[in-house]
């Protein structure tokens, strides 16, 4: 596993900031490289909160063993591991993430504590056949300009997995996005952990909360990026 490498932007210990694992101590493994440019529609700005990790060259070449060593250095006990980016399932990151996930699962499976790493993925890359992971699966809405890149088969795989730790995240820019989110949930009969998160600086949490309050039966829950309330735009915390 020393020969298999990818570009890793950063590895650090913090608290999970959003979704069902909010507040849980977590080791973040951020890989470099993502081909999506969310929010960059006509006359509007990129909203990605990690633009510094979009380039595949925005990191240090690391092997699977080096990443495992860094994880062990950060925490001697088993805590949640989150593979994020960039996009951990795109390009060469994909094979790297699968190999890393398999090794973490092999090491941790007997302990019973967080044996499966969580993968934050943008919805464009397939999640098929990856039982060694739990997923935070994005679905990009019209306001992102990236909805045509979504792999719709992932929604069916999400349902088939029936993993209570999996979640689908919808990032909401405006009312049109919210209505489209409700359409997707109904059309694909989605249940489970369905998260709605506002685009920071473009939609207030208060407004999104009101919309969710009156979308009874959708199964949506509000998800706020709590790490931004604690640390602002600081990186690696």
Swiss-Prot record:
Which is one GO molecular function term here? S-adenosyl-L-methionine binding
Query: Which InterPro entries does the record associate with it?
Result: 7-CO-7-deazaguanine_synth-like, Aldolase_TIM, rSAM
Tell me the keywords, alphabetical order: 4Fe-4S, Iron, Iron-sulfur, Lyase, Magnesium, Metal-binding, Queuosine biosynthesis, S-adenosyl-L-methionine
Q: Give any Pfam family that matches.
A: Fer4_12
- Residues binding [4Fe-4S] cluster: 34, 38, 48
- Detail which positions bind substrate: 15-17, 30, 84
Describe the location of the Radical SAM core domain by residue ranges: 21-233
Tell me the enzyme class.
lyase
What is any one GO biological process for this UniProt entry?
queuosine biosynthetic process
**Sequence positions that bind S-adenosyl-L-methionine:** 86
Q: Give residues annotated as binding Mg(2+).
A: 50
Cofactor binding mode and count: Binds 1 [4Fe-4S] cluster. The cluster is coordinated with 3 cysteines and an exchangeable S-adenosyl-L-methionine.
Q: In which pathway does it act?
A: Purine metabolism; 7-cyano-7-deazaguanine biosynthesis
State what this protein does: Catalyzes the complex heterocyclic radical-mediated conversion of 6-carboxy-5,6,7,8-tetrahydropterin (CPH4) to 7-carboxy-7-deazaguanine (CDG), a step common to the biosynthetic pathways of all 7-deazapurine-containing compounds.
Full protein name: 7-carboxy-7-deazaguanine synthase
The organism is Leptospira interrogans serogroup Icterohaemorrhagiae serovar Lai (strain 56601)
């Amino acid at each position: 596993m020393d020969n298999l490498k990818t570009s890793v932007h950063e590895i650090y210990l913090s608290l999970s900031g959003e979704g069902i694992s909010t507040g849980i101590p977590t080791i973040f493994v951020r890989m470099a490289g993502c081909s999506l440019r969310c929010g960059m529609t006509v006359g509007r700005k990129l909203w990605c909160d990690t633009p510094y990790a979009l380039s595949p060259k925005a990191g240090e070449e690391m092997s699977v063993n080096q990443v495992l060593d860094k994880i062990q250095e950060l925490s001697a006990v088993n805590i949640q591991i989150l593979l994020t980016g960039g996009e951990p399932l795109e390009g060469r990151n994909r094979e790297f993430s699968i190999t890393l996930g398999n090794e973490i699962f092999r090491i941790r499976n007997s302990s019973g504590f967080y044996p499966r790493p969580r993968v934050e993925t943008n919805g464009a890359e397939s999640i098929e056949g990856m039982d060694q992971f739990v997923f935070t699966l994005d679905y990009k809405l019209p306001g992102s300009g990236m909805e045509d890149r979504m792999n719709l088969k992932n929604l069916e795989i999400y349902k088939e997995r029936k993993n209570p730790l999996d979640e689908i995240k919808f990032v909401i820019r405006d009312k049109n996005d919210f209505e489209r989110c409700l359409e997707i949930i109904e059309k694909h009969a989605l249940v489970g952990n369905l998260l709605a998160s506002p685009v920071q600086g473009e939609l207030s949490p208060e407004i999104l909360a009101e919309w969710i309050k009156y979308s009874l039966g959708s199964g949506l829950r509000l998800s706020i990026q709590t790490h931004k309330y604690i640390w602002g735009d600081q990186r690696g915390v």
